A protein has these predicted regions:
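Acidic/polar low-complexity surface segments
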Residues: 98-132, 136-161, 178-179, 183-184, ...
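Right-handed parallel beta-helix
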Residues: 44, 264, 288-297, 319-332, ...
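Bacterial N-terminal signal peptides
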Residues: 2-9
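Short edge beta-strand/loop segments characteristic of extracellular beta-sandwich folds
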Residues: 197-199, 214, 706-712
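Extracellular beta-sheet-rich ligand-binding/adhesion modules
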Residues: 16-155, 169-176, 180-186, 190, ...
Length: 776
């Protein structure tokens, strides 16, 4: 009956035409009169339900429940929420609108789009403007759908509309939860299969949902080998499709593809993806979180700041907000942009097909954000955006891109992306020196060269099947500037497979542990300068498994140590497994290897060698010292091999001291036995960085506050303390934690959480919440 009422109240086509052509200031506005249902005439001034082409305002103090599934033709021009608009959680709803602005203001002006007025903190005594499309405690029910269609209306600013914008208000989108938004394949999926097996059971997936099965071979995504299908059946760990697969997808052994569900029952979409697309934006001092919502066909192509999902210059004012389980797909401008924003938690999200980088940290000031267990699929190359903050970014299509590494990246997978899976890029220019204002652990701000900031944590990440050049490009362009040897970049438990260039490490001071690479090139174009590698496997490479310093420049600046290096099934074709660098401009360059193994080595060339100069240009050595390579224990305990180039100063000074020893040496390298050479320790890591804690959820039940949160640290977290009590560790290292506290009858109640790590560092800037409902 509510739908019929809406149609009857607005029936004059002439009004639509007039509203569309009128100037924004002349368009009639209808305001709420009281709290009530959208479909109730008594809720609105004049007793008239909002009609197509109108401006609508929910006034301060009013709570309006959106309870209609309006026809697509009924498009509200703009919706200004100064009070609260909440979508009915138990019935299907649809809202077509040109602009939603969540702001505590009586104005219905469509200007001031960038919310500059909210640079200063708003008065805490004033109520927030609120948009609730479900809440974390009561999401939109699984059997219904809430749909917002962002629809361009003639006369609106094309560069900014249609849009949803939150200006110091609260904006929440919460759909029915899924146990997993994406999982690994449990068995191989072959061409012609109409059913696949998942690596684990899932709940929340249903017949009719759209899924994607990721490409698993190098370069496949150019032919759209990441395949979309519709679920036709589900049984246990098996999912059936409407159509058979057209390609094979790996699903056993060490490397498996992924299957991801794109659908949610809370949807924000562009009404005209081929025309003017919509975008969403949170501004400074806003609040709210997102869980299990779908953002599809959003993002304005080639337009700065108009992204599918955008946290814009929020600083630390949105600490406590999170994006969990979201699906962001078909974007013309990124999936999720974190711009000048700290402490955001992004977990279990799926990004599929974007123009330009996918999960994107925009301007180099972002710190203490957590990106955990997200899947990035087919971020495709775009163009540089006009007036972008960092001019060096070519927007070439990285699954994950950042310029400031002081963030946490864990358990993420980048599959079938454009130029990069993971890309850290910070290149100074004549106009930009990269000394930027960065928040410190105590909350103060300091001017820091962002190239000197290492990861909080980079662990358990994976990249495969890139259609462009790189799996993981760490710091190409930093010009040898990075953290010192006591605060190195640390990369742990990384898988890189079926890409062209596996790992390009160009930062100084780097510790890599437990990395597996299966690609055309292994460790490529490295800047070996205080680099430490432990337990590295390079498999099935055909060219330059372990490249010389800076590739064709053949130059090494510092110490390299490798402890545990296995080459498996490499097809080197006369190329050495380990290349020697020619030049040593600092005089300190040297390489030490221990535990080198070559398994199933496929090379019938007479130039077969473990250590040699290798292919590519042969620059004439220019420095007084070369770069010797020590293979510890090669001749037995305490009997080490010193391998040098036959063009090096060391060889030319004492040629009789060296000899050929295939397959260790090749046509341009020889070896001398040396005794008991020390295996150096070029890094001396210390942990002086305090942990970072975020309260992500607070709910009141049975007289208690039930509190959830996350914590990140570069070392081991010893404890999380909330109001003087220790929280429970839900996942390792307190990545997620929980606690229950007695709810005090007085309001508001203050909740304070901080963490302490095993090195004795205590968080200097606890997360403090005053007033706990609604949250955040």
């Amino acid at each position: 009956m509510a739908l019929i009422t809406v149609i009857i109240v607005f029936s004059a086509a002439d009004d639509i035409s007039h509203a569309a052509e009128a100037k924004p200031a002349d368009i009639p506005a209808i305001r709420s009169l009281r709290t009530g249902a959208w479909s109730d005439t008594a809720t609105w001034e004049g007793g008239r339900i909002p009609a197509a082409g109108m401006k609508v305002q929910v006034r301060p103090g009013h709570v309006v429940t959106y309870d209609v599934e309006a026809p697509e033709s009924l498009v509200i021009r703009s919706l200004h929420i100064a009070g609260t608009l909440t979508f009915a959680p138990d019935k299907s709803t649809r809202l077509s609108v040109g602009l939603i602005k969540v702001e505590n203001s009586e104005s219905t002006d469509e200007e001031g789009f960038d919310c500059d007025a909210h640079a200063e903190e708003p008065d805490a005594a004033q109520p927030r403007a609120v948009l609730l499309v479900g809440t974390a405690e009561r999401p939109i029910a699984v059997n219904v759908r809430a749909l917002i269609r962002l629809t361009y209306i003639a006369g609106m600013k094309q560069e900014s509309c249609p849009a949803i914008v939150c200006c110091a208000g609260r904006m929440d989108f919460h759909g029915a939860p899924l146990s997993r938004t994406w999982v690994k394949l449990g068995t191989p999926a072959a061409k012609g299969d109409k059913q696949v097996t998942l690596s684990e059971p899932v709940t929340g997936w249903k017949v009719g949902d759209t899924i994607v099965v990721t490409a698993t071979q190098f370069g496949e995504s150019k032919d759209n080998v990441t395949e979309e299908r519709t679920i036709s059946s589900m049984s246990g760990n098996s999912v059936g499709f409407d159509e058979p697969l057209a390609h094979d997808h790996s699903g056993t052994g060490e490397f498996q593809g992924e299957i991801a569900n794109l659908n949610r029952n809370v949807v924000v979409e562009s009404a005209d993806p081929a025309g003017e697309r919509g975008h969403t934006m949170y501004h400074r001092h806003s609040a709210g979180s997102i869980s299990y919502a779908e953002f599809r066909n959003l993002g304005k192509k080639d337009t700065l700041g108009r992204y599918s999902l955008h946290f814009h210059l929020a600083g630390s004012t949105m600490r406590g907000s999170s994006v969990v389980g979201a699906s962001i797909h078909g974007s013309h401008n990124r999936w999720l942009t974190i711009h000048g924003t700290n402490y955001l938690v992004v977990r279990d999200c799926v990004g599929y097909r974007s123009v330009g980088h996918g999960f994107f940290l925009e301007d180099g000031t972002e710190v203490y954000n957590v990106l955990d267990r997200n899947l990035a699929v087919e971020a495709r190359p775009g163009r540089k955006l006009p007036k972008q903050v960092l001019p060096f970014d070519q927007n070439e299509g990285a699954g994950f891109w950042w310029a400031n590494s002081l963030n946490t990246f864990t358990r993420n997978v980048a599959a079938a992306n454009g130029h990069y899976g993971f890309r850290y890029e910070a290149t100074p220019t004549s106009a930009l020196k990269l000394v930027l204002p960065v928040m410190q652990s105590d909350g103060s701000e300091a001017a820091i060269d962002i190239r000197t900031l290492p990861f909080v944590r980079f662990e358990d990440n994976e990249v495969h099947s890139s259609q462009g050049l790189y799996g993981f490009n760490l710091g190409e362009g930093v010009q040898r500037i990075g953290p010192d040897a006591r605060h190195p970049f640390v990369v742990r438990n990384t898988k890189i497979w079926n890409v062209h260039y596996g790992f390009r490490p160009q930062v100084p001071s780097l510790l890599v542990e437990n990395m597996t690479i299966q690609s055309h090139y292994g460790v490529y174009h490295p800047n070996f300068d205080n680099h430490v590698y432990r337990n590295i496997t390079i498999r099935q490479t055909s060219t330059e498994p372990f490249n010389r310093g800076h590739d064709d420049d053949s130059i090494q600046y510092g110490v390299l140590t490798v402890d545990g290096l296995t080459f498996d099934s490499c097809r080197s074709g006369g190329m050495p497994l380990i290349q020697i660098s020619d030049d040593n401009p600092t005089g300190n360059a040297v390489s030490h290897f221990r535990g080198v193994n070559a398994l199933n080595w496929q090379d019938n060339s007479r130039d077969k060698a473990i250590v040699n100069l290798g292919g590519g240009p042969r620059p004439t050595p220019k420095t007084e010292k070369g770069v010797p390579i020590y293979i510890h224990g090669w001749f037995g305990p305490g009997r080490d091999a010193m391998v040098v180039s036959t063009r090096s100063p060391e060889f030319k000074a004492r040629p009789a001291a060296f000899h050929a020893e295939p397959p260790l040496t090749g046509n341009q390298s020889q070896v001398a036995e040396v005794a008991n050479v020390d295996f150096p320790q070029p890094l001396d890591p210390i942990d002086d960085l305090p942990p970072a804690t975020v309260i992500t959820d607070i709910r009141k039940h049975d007289g208690k506050w039930h509190i959830l949160g996350t914590c990140s640290d570069n070392g081991a977290v010893a404890r999380v303390v909330v109001n003087g009590r220790e929280a429970r560790e839900l996942t390792p290292n307190f990545a997620t934690w929980a606690i229950e506290l007695d709810a005090q009858p007085q309001a508001p109640q203050t909740i304070v959480a901080h963490a302490e790590d095993a090195a004795g560092n205590i968080e200097k800037l606890p997360h403090r919440v005053v007033g706990t409902m609604p949250w955040p």
